[in-house]
């Protein structure tokens, strides 16, 4: 069975032992130990992941007891039953831009001495979440969470074995690094234009998913599709236009599920975006006020998959919503019906957003 590089790294961290079997490894800028995984502690994990993301990435390793640091393994199936989409939604509701992460688990075989003095082999389940270093720093809290003392606008950073609010020196470093990245990106664009000519170029705007071409045909792609493409596709260097000069010829391969990530055609707007807000509320059998709150909370107007603003005159605009928007809201309403307090909180935040 193929072992991922992250599993290998976690096993390496856990391999350093003292004579009594306790872990020699300590928590540091890239490692956090947790005894168990609890769905009610998502904010705790998200805060640590945001801190890792703002530094150089890192691992949360589950199944490790503190004081003394020893491997006990996970005692229930909470970690194995994680719904990754739900966890992603919970994390990205708290922090922005999106945090990229992976998780996994494995069985660690440990030698132990039982009550009879016999050496036995015990299987212990270890879980891990790896957080990538963010390409777009800083990752910022966009929502309050009183239990973890998270306030909208907070920036967390990983310092040695602690997650803390970022200090001046590290914030200055992030700002300088981002400015350098933008300068380097501009230089690359200018160099590419100089070598290839502006008339041959197309531009992808990752913020709105718009692909502009030199042929007068623009295509809008859902941002999640672009993210999945960049994450899942494998870029394989297979030669170049010239053996001695020129840019490499890249073949793009990958197995990407496009079931719900189909680019939205703009030719027939009434068919693609059939609902105004009043019609959408009627379809969902909810009040317009509740609909406005849900649209605001889930930021649906920011995605062309769900929403399109149409100018009808010099002073008037209308908001149209897609069939994807109807399906998305139906699912969310079913979820919120099971948690009335959450729905009331959404409506309350919407009503107080400008106060």
From Swiss-Prot:
Disulfide cross-links: none
Pfam families: SLFN_AlbA_2
Swiss-Prot/TrEMBL keywords: ATP-binding, Nucleotide-binding
Molecular-function annotations in GO: ATP binding
Sequence positions that bind ATP: 58-65
The name this protein goes by in its record: Uncharacterized ATP-binding protein UU034
Source organism: Ureaplasma parvum serovar 3 (strain ATCC 700970)
